[in-house]
Swiss-Prot record:
Signal peptide from the UniProt entry: none
Taxonomic lineage of the native organism: Bacteria, Pseudomonadati, Campylobacterota, Epsilonproteobacteria, Campylobacterales
Species assigned in the record: Helicobacter pylori (strain HPAG1)
Domain of life per record: Bacteria
GO molecular function, one term: ribosomal large subunit binding
The protein's name: Ribosome-recycling factor
Region feature (Disordered): 138-158
Entries under CDD domains matching the protein: RRF
Subcellular location: Cytoplasm
GO BP terms, alphabetized: cytoplasmic translational termination
Length: 185
């Protein structure tokens, strides 16, 4: 019973950490990642479709991405979607592929993006604390319903706190690593 609560809590907290790392992949660091385009949708025959599902996206170097659509008639639509996404770059359409040349980031831009990373980390910590609160409430309900003793309840809450501390530590490490990657010149 308590083990199920621990397992569920650990699983939900791991998912929060994974979601944070997924969100981090959309932030730009010193080297441009293809993941920066993950949120862009292209109108594919009337259906909003992820950019990486209508063509291949690859990194040519630290500041250049290339998109090769599987259907050449999508070039204009992809170009329009990128412009509307407002990611700070103008698409360069050569009739075969679209190249995105990202300018080097200024120190000010790096600091702003690092600040965004920190805010994402704080959001993840709030999610983890909410998961802890839910788990503690389940334990307190078991105690109230006389299914576990007060001592078992206290031990269970301590165990939940340990799981929470581990998740918060992972979040802090992820934030620090991302900030370092962003601020690295």
């Amino acid at each position: 019973m308590l083990q199920a609560i621990y397992n569920e809590t650990k699983d939900l907290m791991q998912k929060s950490v994974q979601a944070l790392n997924r969100d981090f992949s959309t932030l730009r660091s010193a080297k441009v990642s293809v993941n920066i385009l993950d949120h862009i949708k292209v109108d594919y025959y009337g259906t909003p479709t992820a950019l990486n599902q209508v063509g291949s996206v690859m990194s040519l170097d630290a500041t250049t991405l290339q998109i090769s659509p599987w259907e050449k008639n999508l070039l204009k639509e992809i170009e329009r979607s990128i412009q509307e996404a407002n990611i700070g770059v103008n698409p360069n359409n050569d009739g075969e592929t679209i190249k995105l040349f990202f300018p080097p980031m200024t120190t000010e831009q790096r600091k702003l993006i690092a600040k965004d990373a920190k805010a994402m980390g704080e959001k993840a910590k709030v999610a983890v604390r909410n998961i802890r609160q839910d788990a503690n409430n389940k334990v307190k309900k078991l105690e109230k319903d006389k299914e576990i003793s007060e001592d078992e309840s206290k031990k269970a809450q301590e165990q939940i706190q340990k799981i929470t501390d581990e998740a918060i530590k992972k979040i802090d490490e992820s934030v620090k690593n991302k900030e370092d990657a962003i601020l690295k010149v």
